[in-house]
Amino acid sequence: MIEFQQVHKTYRVAGREIPALNPTSLTIEDGQVFGLIGHSGAGKSTMLRLINRLEEPSGGTIIVDGEDVTAFNASQLRGFRQQVGMIFQHFNLLASKTVADNVALPLALAGELSRSEIDKRVTELLARVGLSDHAKKYPAQLSGGQKQRVGIARALSTNPKILLCDEATSALDPQTTASVLQLLAEINRELKLTIVLITHEMDVIRRVCDRVAVMDAGQIVEQGSVAEVFLHPQHPTTKRFVQEDEQVDEGEQRDDFAHVPGRIVRLTFQGDATYAPLLGTVARETGVDYSILAGRIDRIKDVPYGQLTLALIGGDMEAAFARFKAADVHMEVLR
């Protein structure tokens, strides 16, 4: 478990103190994939790097597995960092070393394994990330996605309990991003690693995370399960991220719907309810006609969800609303 207890970070620049992270408390459970999302300058990178003390906190306490990381001396910190892997946006591979040597580097520096043991471990790691045939290649011979897979293998080399991902997919194309996220999900599931990732893309959060914290101006403005935050955003920053992900402009949508008669509602379905024939049933039972104005079906991690924007006309409107709520469908009345 990772706990932030009123942790804050301030930089001193040209004689002025610039807050990067306001006093923040947060708990990340073992085995979770936890996402920190925010625009540039929100404080997410600072928060991530505080976990392994690449950034030193200005105050507060960071507890990992019951131990106060902020109180570690240099020797304790070195040992702790071997339990925390990290992957980066720009891969940070050594150009003069082969793929195998890049992955072996942390093990060689630790000095705890023989050469044959290191070679065996590297072979296992390259197989896990799908690069067994690339061991003798150099970084310049790899695609961006392959470079990131090398970075992931290197981060796993010391059998960490925690994996920190610093914008790990932001330099990749959508297809490669999807494959890297799938790999991270497999690693989380099979190795029971706690993964903390930062991103500015809601799609990344939706694909792989269990819980998410939304950051803005150095503070967490909203947090919860990905389904709660993604489907029912409360803070304006969260709503902007969701709109960007859905590629929806609410102002334009309101204008488009201005001429549509009746009540306009947005329904959100999760799990099995996503595929249930609810609209037809409600229409028959209440006499309410409907027009579908917008809709989508997608997934949050492995759970399907659907959203429909409807115009409802005639019949027993209150009975229709009650029927939607009884079916455990979230309903938002837009007009």
Curated annotation (Swiss-Prot):
ATP binds at residues 38-45. InterPro entries: AAA+_ATPase, ABC_transporter-like_ATP-bd, ABC_transporter-like_CS, ACT-like_dom_sf, MetN_ABC, MetN_ABC_transporter-like, NIL_domain, P-loop_NTPase. It comes from the Bacteria. The lineage of its organism: Bacteria, Pseudomonadati, Pseudomonadota, Gammaproteobacteria, Pseudomonadales. This is Methionine import ATP-binding protein MetN 1. It comes from Pseudomonas putida (strain ATCC 47054 / DSM 6125 / CFBP 8728 / NCIMB 11950 / KT2440). Its EC number is 7.4.2.11. It is an enzyme of class 7 (translocase). It catalyses: L-methionine(out) + ATP + H2O = L-methionine(in) + ADP + phosphate + H(+); D-methionine(out) + ATP + H2O = D-methionine(in) + ADP + phosphate + H(+). The complex is composed of two ATP-binding proteins (MetN), two transmembrane proteins (MetI) and a solute-binding protein (MetQ). Keywords: Amino-acid transport, ATP-binding, Cell inner membrane, Cell membrane, Membrane, Nucleotide-binding, Translocase, Transport. It is found in: Cell inner membrane. Pfam families: ABC_tran (PF00005), NIL (PF09383). It is a peripheral membrane protein. The gene is metN1.
